[in-house]
Amino acid sequence: MPRIIKHLGRVDYEPTWRAMQAFTDSRGAETRDELWVVEHPPVFTQGLAGKPEHLLQQNDVPVVKTDRGGQITYHGPGQLVVYLLVDFKRMHVGVRELVRRIEQAIIDMLAEQGIAANGDVDAPGVYVDGAKIASLGLRIKNGATYHGLSLNVDMDLTPFSWINPCGYANLKVTQMKNLGVNLTVAEAADKLLPHLERHLSTSKETA
């Protein structure tokens, strides 16, 4: 079944998260997968493993405790967020392979823009010369995923210095703009989505 792509624009984090939960709770065997393309106003989200000490500096950015995996991260304008509402039982792959495919989609998209990036088996996400450019966080429920990925496109990276991103002290972050690629979030989405569609194919051979 073809996936439904929804471009939702700039939306608040918490109601979007609640909508993902509701979608996942109500989906059935024939429900089509959806990819939600969004930006968020400034917000820190703290995953199930999140520890308060990873918020290093008090500030005006709200902190939302959420139900994805992982630690604390930052979302803000100029960052592409894609939520993956996927029945991964249909793909006949495990969670680790699903994460690898999402990472590879981002790596392939960045390569097209002349950016050499890589994953890290010990720390999910995508990195350029050791600096994180994309983060992943998923929740699995009844064989389906929600939450997803964030890719730094053209944003103010300062709030990342107020946290230990993803729980790692002194982790550097980067973005496409700093690497010489000037795209809007919408343009970055248009370039990433075909790679996501390909890597989320149900066929193991085509990923």
UniProtKB/Swiss-Prot annotation:
Membrane-spanning ranges: none
Site (Lowers pKa of active site Cys): K132
Location of the active site: C166 (acyl-thioester intermediate)
GO CC annotations on file: cytoplasm
Broad enzyme group: transferase
EC assignment: 2.3.1.181
Swiss-Prot/TrEMBL catalytic activity: octanoyl-[ACP] + L-lysyl-[protein] = N(6)-octanoyl-L-lysyl-[protein] + holo-[ACP] + H(+)
Domain BPL/LPL catalytic: residue ranges: 29-204
Protein name: Octanoyltransferase
